[in-house]
């Protein structure tokens, strides 16, 4: 089973936490980890920029890449946000199974378009 680690930076810690909560609720990700605020340095509009940002580490399944990207782009305040999808070389079988179960409707099918598993 494959698992993706998705790296996203965000300027607002509270908005970033709301974003992660939304993504977990919609089963686009199994979990998200918010790293403490750090400093990013980059060129934008021809000049060096310095921004305080939190880094999000999101775990998902490859089938959710497109809907996850769309949702992040929809909610993110940046014109060009950092969204990096990294395929894990190796993941323990139990963790991969948990990620898949957390990102699916329980039948192995992704719920990537925002479907949330309803009552059984």
Predicted regions: what is each one?
Residues 1-120:
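Positively charged, small/polar-rich N-terminal and surface patches that mediate targeting and assembly
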């Amino acid at each position: 089973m494959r698992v993706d680690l998705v790296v996203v930076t965000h300027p607002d810690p509270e908005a970033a936490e709301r974003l992660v909560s939304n993504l977990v609720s919609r089963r686009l990700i199994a979990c998200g980890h918010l790293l403490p605020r750090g400093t990013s340095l980059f060129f934008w509009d021809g000049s060096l920029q310095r921004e305080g940002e939190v880094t999000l580490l999101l775990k998902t399944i490859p089938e959710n890449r497109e809907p996850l990207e769309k949702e992040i782009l929809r909610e993110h305040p940046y014109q060009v946000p950092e969204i990096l999808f990294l395929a894990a070389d190796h993941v323990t079988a139990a963790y991969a199974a948990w990620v898949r179960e957390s990102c699916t409707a329980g039948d192995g099918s992704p719920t990537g378009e925002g479907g949330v598993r309803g009552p059984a």
